[in-house]
Amino acid sequence: MTTLIVSSNRIAQYWALTKPRVTQLAVFCAVIGMFLATPDLPDWKIVIAATIGIWLLAGAAFAINCLVEREIDSRMARTARRPMAQGEITVPQTLVFSGVIGGAGMWVLYNFVNPLTMWLTFATFVGYAVIYTIILKPATPQNIVIGGLSGAMPPALGWAAVANDLPMQAWILVLIIFIWTPPHFWALALYRRDEYAKSGLPMLPITHGTAFTQFHIWLYTIALVATTMLPFAVGMSGLIYLVVAAVLDVIFMWYAWQVYRHYTDMIARKMFTYSIIYLSLLFAALLVDHYLRF
């Protein structure tokens, strides 16, 4: 019984390294991209293989992130319980784990999907685990903006998996997530600013102040609203998406305005939480509209 408990705890620790909640949202957006890439239903074998491969490589990237930021995580209440921050998993163990699941993901994508998706997903891995985590995040308060492309790539990965191509429509999906990322993370950085100050990371509220950050959340929100209209503007989606996007955008703008003009930590926290719901519902609306367009 003791052995089973220890094994279960170890599995849970490795699972936590992959940041499962973040991975789930990324993979969800990738799956939506798979369905939007074809007017019919995509091949279920491709969907399953691509989902597994993208999930594995995303998990590998997040494991490297946990490794690199283990000391920073230990100084922040939000992240102090992560396995690397707690010293529950060693550096060699994390490297091996990331290498194994990342390699497995590449193998699945190459053999059961297509080389384009494998290389794009690998490039996304490098973009997040190396360029963003190691280079940009500790160096500039614009880390979220510059490094946001890697986090925005999942729908393009899904599209490439099914179509073996990346047309304009796929990049519109990437652009939506790219513009969504700064207000999403800056809302978190605002109400967690004391923790980020202890971490040593140059997050925007620390380097430029809260008022500057609040204003830029509002600016990016305006840009996001305009960007979410692109699928309808180019004929990629219809009225169902337009109506849902408009409602979601109005709520997002309300939160952003409150953060900008009537700031409290509570409203920033609510905006951060809503931004996750927002992105999920926005992509779900794209999927529903794709098959029920009128």
UniProtKB/Swiss-Prot annotation:
Associated pathway: Porphyrin-containing compound metabolism; heme O biosynthesis; heme O from protoheme: step 1/1
Listed GO CC annotations: plasma membrane
Keywords on record: Cell inner membrane, Cell membrane, Heme biosynthesis, Membrane, Transferase, Transmembrane, Transmembrane helix
Originating organism: Herminiimonas arsenicoxydans
GO MF annotations, alphabetized: protoheme IX farnesyltransferase activity
Subcellular location: Cell inner membrane
Function: Converts heme B (protoheme IX) to heme O by substitution of the vinyl group on carbon 2 of heme B porphyrin ring with a hydroxyethyl farnesyl side group.
Gene Ontology BP, a term: heme O biosynthetic process
Transmembrane regions listed in the UniProt entry: 22-42, 46-66, 89-109, 116-136, 143-163, 170-190, 211-231, 232-252, 272-292
EC class (word): transferase
Name this polypeptide is given: Protoheme IX farnesyltransferase
Gene encoding the protein: ctaB
Catalytic reactions on record: heme b + (2E,6E)-farnesyl diphosphate + H2O = Fe(II)-heme o + diphosphate
Miscellaneous comment text of the record: Carbon 2 of the heme B porphyrin ring is defined according to the Fischer nomenclature.
Gene3D superfamilies: UbiA prenyltransferase
Membrane topology: Multi-pass membrane protein
EC number: 2.5.1.141
